[in-house]
């Protein structure tokens, strides 16, 4: 007898293994995996564009330093009523509770500072990193599965997700199965990744040659579009009064992405795209 698909969507728990005082959590492992794969991919894309891959290695350190604390701060700010009562939990990032929009904001600011200090074009770096960002998001979303968090409304669809009673919202405690919104977003992110990689290699072959900044703008608009819909299904959205913060930010991301694309293709002078190669830097 075939097992129901819901059985496959039952989290084994947030902890992968405990070795003495050391606890390895799925969430941390997935974030580390996403970073490693993202750095490797961005270096590969840099080589294809004849850009020094070491530049992307250096940038990745800045992105992690900028993105992860910003993601946590963003989350804590919009859950301040809870963390004000338990301030010791503010730094407990291993328990979950980071916001991707905070990571995007923090990472972008870090990349801008990096580009300024290194005197390299920000937009070409952004294009090289965009596919890695969305792939990392697709991987990292599975941390929500293991933590039994960021799920959607109750559902009886075949791919429903079982949520333990202690993780259910108080007003939905009688329901067992919920929309696996982590899965929806992970699949959407993989689709955006496929689009960006296709555009990258077609541009590399000149079919057509994209303007610098295009990939990042496409990333911003398409990711935000998917998040706008998926956020509407969730039961634990960060709120500001009656507004779902992620939907407001997603609408802003769609507008900025589309406006950015229009700006890139209307302006007559293209953005600079000269980044030193390994040969130029002697590395």
UniProtKB/Swiss-Prot annotation:
HAMAP family: Lgt. One of its GO terms (cellular component) is plasma membrane. It is a multi-pass membrane protein. It is found in: Cell inner membrane. A 1,2-diacyl-sn-glycero-3-phospho-(1'-sn-glycerol) binds at residue 141. Pfam families: LGT. Keywords: Cell inner membrane, Cell membrane, Membrane, Transferase, Transmembrane, Transmembrane helix. GO terms for molecular function: phosphatidylglycerol-prolipoprotein diacylglyceryl transferase activity. The chain crosses the membrane at residues 19-39, 59-79, 90-110, 120-140, 181-201, 212-232, 245-265. Belongs to the Lgt family. The keyword Cell membrane applies. GO terms for biological process: lipoprotein biosynthetic process. Catalyzes the transfer of the diacylglyceryl group from phosphatidylglycerol to the sulfhydryl group of the N-terminal cysteine of a prolipoprotein, the first step in the formation of mature lipoproteins. This is Phosphatidylglycerol--prolipoprotein diacylglyceryl transferase. The lineage of its organism: Bacteria, Bacillati, Cyanobacteriota, Cyanophyceae, Nostocales. It comes from Nostoc sp. (strain PCC 7120 / SAG 25.82 / UTEX 2576). The gene is lgt.
């Amino acid at each position: 007898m075939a097992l129901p698909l819901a059985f496959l969507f039952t989290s084994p728990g947030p902890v992968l293994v405990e070795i003495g005082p050391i606890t390895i959590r799925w969430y941390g492992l997935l974030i580390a995996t996403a970073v490693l794969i993202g750095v490797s991919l961005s270096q590969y894309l840099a080589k294809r564009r004849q850009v020094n891959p070491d530049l992307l290695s250096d940038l990745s350190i800045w992105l992690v330093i900028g993105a992860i604390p910003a993601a946590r701060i963003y989350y804590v700010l919009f859950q301040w009523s809870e963390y004000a009562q338990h301030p010791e939990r503010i730094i407990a990032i291993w328990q979950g509770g980071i916001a991707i929009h905070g990571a995007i904001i923090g990472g972008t600011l870090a990349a801008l500072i990096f580009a300024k200090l290194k005197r390299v074009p920000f937009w070409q770096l952004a294009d090289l990193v965009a596919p890695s960002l969305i792939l990392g998001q697709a991987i990292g979303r599975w941390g929500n599965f293991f933590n039994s968090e960021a799920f959607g409304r109750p559902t009886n669809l075949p791919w429903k997700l079982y949520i333990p009673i202690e993780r259910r919202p108080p007003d939905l405690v009688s329901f067992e199965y919920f929309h696996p919104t982590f899965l929806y977003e992970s699949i959407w992110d993989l689709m955006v990744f496929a689009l960006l990689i296709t555009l990258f290699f077609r541009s590399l072959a000149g079919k057509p040659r994209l303007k610098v900044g295009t990939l990042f703008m496409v990333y911003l608009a398409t990711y935000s579009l998917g998040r706008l819909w998926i956020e509407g299904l969730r039961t634990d959205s960060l709120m500001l009064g009656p507004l779902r913060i992620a939907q407001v930010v997603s609408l802003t991301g769609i507008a900025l992405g589309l406006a950015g694309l229009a700006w890139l293709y209307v302006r007559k002078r293209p953005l600079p795209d000269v980044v030193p190669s390994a040969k130029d830097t002697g590395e």
